[in-house]
Every structure is written in structure tokens, then in C-alpha cells.
From Swiss-Prot:
NCBIfam families registered for this protein in UniProt: cdhB (TIGR00315)
GO biological process: methanogenesis, from acetate
GO molecular function, a single term: anaerobic carbon-monoxide dehydrogenase activity
Entry-linked HAMAP family: CdhB
Subunit structure: Heterotetramer of two alpha and two epsilon subunits. The ACDS complex is made up of alpha, epsilon, beta, gamma and delta subunits with a probable stoichiometry of (alpha(2)epsilon(2))(4)-beta(8)-(gamma(1)delta(1))(8).
Role according to the record: Part of a complex that catalyzes the reversible cleavage of acetyl-CoA, allowing growth on acetate as sole source of carbon and energy. The alpha-epsilon subcomponent functions as a carbon monoxide dehydrogenase. The precise role of the epsilon subunit is unclear; it may have a stabilizing role within the alpha(2)epsilon(2) component and/or be involved in electron transfer to FAD during a potential FAD-mediated CO oxidation.
Gene designation per UniProt: cdhB1
Protein name: Acetyl-CoA decarbonylase/synthase complex subunit epsilon 1
Record organism: Methanosarcina thermophila
Family: Belongs to the CdhB family.
SUPFAM superfamilies tied to this protein: DHS-like NAD/FAD-binding domain
The keyword Transport is assigned to this record: no
Keyword tags: Methanogenesis
InterPro entries: CdhB (IPR003704), DHS-like_NAD/FAD-binding_dom (IPR029035)
Length: 170
């Protein structure tokens, strides 16, 4: 008799997997625990009240920044490690475990996402969610269901308060 129940591996999962809603203290813990984090910012970060907070987050947690779209201009004189990359290319590269990263030191284990259009970043994160082991944490004001973890849908004022709390906890 052949035992067909041994050595089973799950190659596919069915159903919808969505991100876990988190608060700033959980986000701070996850960012602090990451071995190779990368802060990925969209063009929405150029608003002064967001840019100041993004710089503080990057400096406090010592995060390299992947500046997408036209966001690099906001970081040029801020004394942070920011490099330009197209967000779709970044999503593709993150699925390759052999990718050397933006600094040549290897792929990243955690990405922190801020200030993208919801419909846009969800498509990019769909690939990383399904084809890599990279964790993604969205700290934007909109709930991003394809991230591993995300802030919920919050108002702009609540978002500023959440980012300030995150900065204090890092």
C-alpha cells in the first residue's frame, strides 16, 4: 500500500490574504527588528509636513531610502542615504533573493512604505507578497491590503499623529 499522505507540501494557497492592521508601536518594533530594512517613499512625501517626518524616521532608524517618482529631490540636502529607483523595478528586484540591493550589500528583509497612491502600490506589493519573503509595512494614511502590515484608513491629522508617535518609539 502506498502512503500518499507523507511529504506533503503546500504550493498554493486559496482565498484572500490581507495585511494585518497595526499601530505605531508595532510598526516601530518591526522596523527595529528588521535586519535589512528599506524605506520606500512615493512622490506624496514631498509635502513639507510629510517630508520632515520621513527624514526623521530615516535618521532615527538609520534607514536607507528608495526614493521613487520625483521624491528624490526632497532628500538631496537632508543628510540621508536616498537613492532613486522606479517602484515597479524595485518590486521586481525584491522578488529576487540574489539582488544586491541599492547599496550592494544584498536584498532587504523589510520594506517600509510611505506616500503612494493606494491603487498603485497595491499592484507592486502584490508581487512581493506572493513571490518573496520580504515583509512590507505601510505607514501611510490608507490601508494597503497587499502589505504585510498597514496602518488603517485614517485622517490626515491622525496620520501625522501616528507618524510622530512612530518617530518617538523608534
Amino acid at each position: 500500500m502506498v502512503d500518499t499522505t507523507k511529504n506533503t507540501k503546500l504550493f498554493t494557497s486559496y482565498g484572500v490574504t490581507t495585511s494585518k492592521a497595526i499601530n505605531p508601536d508595532m510598526a516601530a518594533k518591526m522596523i527595529s527588528k528588521a535586519k535589512r530594512p528599506l524605506f520606500v517613499v512615493g512622490t506624496g512625501v514631498l509635502r513639507p509636513e510629510i517630508l520632515d517626518r520621513a527624514v526623521k524616521i530615516a535618521k532615527k532608524a538609520n534607514l536607507p531610502i528608495a526614493a521613487t517618482g520625483s521624491s528624490l529631490n526632497g532628500f538631496l540636502d537632508k543628510d540621508v542615504d536616498a537613492k532613486y529607483i522606479n517602484v515597479h523595478q524595485l518590486g521586481f528586484y525584491l522578488t529576487d533573493p540574489a539582488w544586491p540591493g541599492l547599496d550592494g550589500k544584498g536584498n532587504y528583509d523589510t520594506i517600509i512604505i510611505l506616500e503612494f497612491k493606494k491603487y498603485y502600490i497595491n499592484q507592486v506589493l502584490s508581487g512581493t507578497k506572493n513571490f518573496s519573503k520580504v515583509k512590507s509595512i505601510s505607514i501611510g494614511k490608507d490601508y494597503i491590503q497587499n502589505a504585510t502590515m498597514s496602518f488603517g484608513n485614517i485622517s490626515r491629522e491622525e496620520h501625522f499623529a501616528a507618524l510622530d508617535e512612530l518617530i518617538d518609539l523608534l
